[in-house]
């Protein structure tokens, strides 16, 4: 389980996302 804050944040790449979130296919961090 990644430590990912549960906020809806748009992204283009993993580095756009906080914590250990990654950029998902739908264009949001998760």
Curated annotation (Swiss-Prot):
PROSITE patterns, per database record: SQUASH_INHIBITOR (PS00286)
InterPro entries (UniProt xref): Prot_inh_squash, Proteinase_amylase_inhib_sf
Taxonomic superkingdom: Eukaryota
Main location: secreted
Site-annotated residues for Reactive bond: 6-7
One term under GO cellular component: extracellular region
Pfam family, one: Squash
Family annotation (CDD domains): PlantTI
Cysteine disulfide partners in this protein: 4-21, 11-23, 17-29
Molecular function via GO: serine-type endopeptidase inhibitor activity
Cell location: Secreted
Keyword vocabulary terms for this entry: Disulfide bond, Knottin, Protease inhibitor, Secreted, Serine protease inhibitor
Family statement: Belongs to the protease inhibitor I7 (squash-type serine protease inhibitor) family.
Function per UniProt: Inhibits trypsin.
Record comment regarding domains: The presence of a 'disulfide through disulfide knot' structurally defines this protein as a knottin.
Name by which UniProt lists this protein: Trypsin inhibitor 1
